[in-house]
Structure formats: structure tokens, C-alpha cells
């Protein structure tokens, strides 16, 4: 009897996992041919200062530090490299994802352009542009979304939209084109530990 229950349970788990696996395979297939660039591995003190400023009060307990992944990309064709920064950690992530910051270089440091919530990686920088900045494509999932979908975030002259899940899905036949940044696997021990600012 116990063996039969184990078989039934395993079959139910497999059946539940199949749609998720199929969606994940579909997601990977839609990025076929899109160049993938892993995040940079060296800590960047200026990026860290900008993150801490964006977070406000950042004084994590030991083991609760935020980790970050980043790439430098010229998003507005001015010859300077913005930073796309993905934050992970228990205080910054929810069921829909984590936060991604867009930072623009300014006077030897960075200023916050956008704080985009409920995001996952990779971040696709599209060749399409709006108001002089590349569109950003994210995969919206979790947080009550039963079927994930791609959305395009378009610059409005000052910032990008702050929540991908409020935007319409790209059509099922939409071709995802551009470059996928932060393409390495996000894991609990991965990324760079964000240290609190020194007082």
C-alpha cells in the first residue's frame, strides 16, 4: 500500500512539474540565437554606493546581506556605460522576482535611473529604442502569474516602468532580439555581497 502511494505521489508530482518544465523550455527556446553575456565578477565600489543610496537604510544582519549581479551596457548611445544591476536576497525578493536597478554614470559615480521590481534574469537589451534608450525585455512570472510572458520596458524620457507585471505581454509570435545580460545562473551563494556603507 505504501509503495502504491509513493508511485501515485511521484506521478502527481511529475504531472505538476511538466507544465513548468514545458514553460521553461519554451522560455529558453524563445531566446535561441540571442547572445548571452554573464555578469561581471569584480566588485565595483561606485556601483555599491549607488545601490546603498537607492536602498536607503541598509544595515543587514549577518547572513542576510543582499548580493548583486551587474553588467555595463551603453543604453543611450552616449559613449558611457550604464550599469544594469540585479539584486537578490531575502529582503529584496518576493514570489514575482527581485529588483533590477538601472544606473547612469555621473561625476565619477552613478545615479539611479530606474528601480524595477519583480524581475528575473536575464535582462534582454533590445536593439529597439524609445526616446533614445534601448528597450529592456524581461520575463514576467510568479506573484500569481500562472503563465509567464515577455514584456518590453520602454524609456519615457526619464525612467523605465517600475513593474513589468503591469505591462502587456509581447505577442506569442514576437521575435526576441538583442543581447541577454546577467545570463549566468542566479543562485543563493552567487553574485557579489553588498557591504553596508562605512560610517
Regions found by a protein language model. Give the residues of each.
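An amphipathic, basic-hydrophobic helix/alpha-beta surface used to engage anionic
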Residues: 103
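Beta-propeller blade termini
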Residues: 66-76, 120-135
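Acidic, small-residue rich beta-repeat scaffolds with periodic aromatic anchors
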Residues: 3-5, 9, 15, 19-42, ...
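Blade-edge motifs of beta-propeller repeat domains
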Residues: 24-64, 107-121, 161-166
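Acidic/hydrophobic-patterned starts of short beta strands in beta-sheet-rich repeat architectures
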Residues: 77-88, 131-138
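Structural motif
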Residues: 93-100, 145-151
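Short consensus segments that form the blades of beta-propeller domains
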Residues: 60-61, 89-95, 141-144
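Solvent-exposed coil/turn segments that connect beta secondary-structure elements
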Residues: 88-89, 106-108, 141, 158
Amino acid at each position: 500500500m505504501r509503495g502504491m502511494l509513493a508511485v501515485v505521489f511521484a506521478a502527481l508530482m511529475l504531472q505538476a512539474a511538466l507544465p513548468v518544465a514545458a514553460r521553461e523550455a519554451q522560455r529558453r527556446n524563445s531566446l535561441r540565437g540571442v547572445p548571452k553575456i554573464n555578469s561581471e565578477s569584480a566588485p565595483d565600489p561606485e556601483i555599491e554606493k549607488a545601490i546603498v543610496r537607492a536602498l536607503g537604510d541598509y544595515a543587514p544582519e549577518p547572513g542576510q546581506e543582499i548580493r548583486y549581479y551587474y553588467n555595463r551596457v551603453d543604453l543611450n548611445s552616449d559613449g558611457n556605460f550604464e550599469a544594469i544591476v540585479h539584486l537578490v536576497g531575502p529582503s529584496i525578493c518576493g514570489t514575482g522576482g527581485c529588483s533590477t536597478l538601472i544606473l547612469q554614470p555621473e561625476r565619477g559615480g552613478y545615479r539611479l535611473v530606474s528601480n524595477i521590481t519583480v524581475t528575473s534574469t536575464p535582462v534582454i537589451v533590445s536593439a529597439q529604442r524609445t526616446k533614445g534608450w534601448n528597450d529592456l525585455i524581461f520575463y514576467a512570472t510568479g506573484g500569481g502569474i500562472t503563465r509567464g510572458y515577455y514584456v518590453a520596458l520602454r524609456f519615457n524620457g526619464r525612467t523605465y516602468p517600475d513593474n513589468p507585471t503591469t505591462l502587456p505581454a509581447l505577442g506569442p509570435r514576437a521575435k526576441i532580439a538583442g543581447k541577454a545580460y546577467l545570463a549566468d545562473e542566479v543562485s543563493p551563494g552567487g553574485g557579489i555581497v553588498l557591504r553596508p556603507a562605512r560610517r
